[in-house]
C-alpha cells in the first residue's frame, strides 16, 4: 500500500514540486526591409547635394607631411601635386636654416579653392631628417609632433565649452621619400616607417624616379614592397582597414602594383607636341610629369586627392586618433584636465 502513496498526491502538491515555466525574454524585432516602389518622389537623393553645399560653404582641412633626406625634391613634388607654391624649397631657406642640427617641424598653411570648394591645406616639412652623421632616433620629433596634434584635438573634444568646429591640425597623410638607390631601403627608412606607421598614414614614394631605367624602377619597387612586408610594416591603405570586397580589390591592386609610387616633380613647363606640359629637361629629352609612360606622379595625385583623400581623413580620425585617445584616457584614468576658456571656446573655425 505504501508504494501507492506518491501516486495519491494532490494536484496542489504536484504544482509545488514542478516550477512554473520562465517567461521567454523579449527579443527585439529586427527592422523588416521591404523593397517597395515609392508612390512618388521623396527627395532622399538630395542629401548628397546638401553635403556638397555645406562642404563648399565651410571648406575642409587637409594636412600633409613630407619626410625624407634633403635633395629628394620633396617641396617640388608637393608644389606639383597642388599646382601652387604651397611648400618652400630648400633654396628659399636662409643660409643658417639650410642644415638644421636636429629635425625641425615647419608647418605652412594655405587656402586653395577649386570649383567653389575650399581646402585648408597645411604642408608640414621636416628639414634635417636623415641629414646628420648620426641619425639615430631622428624620427622621434616627428612622432612627437603627430601625437601633439592628437592631444590638441582631444583637449578640445572634452572641453565643456568646446568650439563649434574643432580646428583639425592632425596629420592625415605622410609622404615618405625613398632615395632612388635601386638597391634596398636604408635602416633609417625601415626604422621610421616601422614606428610611424602605427600613428599616421604613410605613403612611400620613390623620389626622382627619372634617374632609373624602367627595369631598375620595376625591380626596386618590388624590392621595397618585399622589405616592407618582411619587416611587418603597413603602409596606407592598410589591409586591415578594407571595408568590403570592392575596397579590398581596389586597394590590393594599389598595394601590389603601384606602391611605392615612383615619381618626378617639376614646376616648369615645356612645349611638347604643341602643348605646354610640366616636365624636367634632361639630355635625353623632356620627362613629362603627368605622363604615365614617364613616371607615376599622376597615379599618386589621383590616389591622394581624387580617390582617397576622404578616406585618409577618416582613417586618421577613426583609427589613429581613436587609438591615441583610448590609450590616453586609459593611462590617465579618465578625461584629461579640462580647460575652460569661454571667450575663446566659442570662436568658430569656418
Curated annotation (Swiss-Prot):
The entry's keywords: Cell cycle, Cell division, Cytoplasm, Cytoskeleton, GTP-binding, Nucleotide-binding, Phosphoprotein, Synapse
Segments of this protein annotated with the region G4 motif: 207-210
Q: Name one GO biological process term.
A: protein catabolic process at presynapse
Which molecular function terms from Gene Ontology are attached?
Answer: GTP binding
The UniProt entry, under Pfam families, shows:
Septin
Q: Where is the Septin-type G domain?
A: 58-331
Tissue specificity comment: Expressed in the brain including the cerebrum, hippocampus and cerebellum (at protein level).
Q: Name one GO cellular component term.
A: presynapse
Q: Does the keyword Cytoplasm apply?
A: yes
The segment annotated G3 motif runs over 125-128
Modified residues annotated as Phosphoserine in this record: 91
Q: Where in the cell is it found?
A: Cytoplasm; Cytoplasm, Cytoskeleton; Synapse
SUPFAM superfamilies in the record:
P-loop containing nucleoside triphosphate hydrolases (SSF52540)
Q: Where is this region: G1 motif?
A: 68-75
Role this protein plays: Filament-forming cytoskeletal GTPase. May play a role in cytokinesis (Potential).
Provide the family line.
Belongs to the TRAFAC class TrmE-Era-EngA-EngB-Septin-like GTPase superfamily. Septin GTPase family.
Spell out the subunit comment. Answer: Septins polymerize into heterooligomeric protein complexes that form filaments, and can associate with cellular membranes, actin filaments and microtubules. GTPase activity is required for filament formation.
Name this protein carries in UniProt: Neuronal-specific septin-3
Q: Which organism is it from?
A: Mus musculus (Mouse)
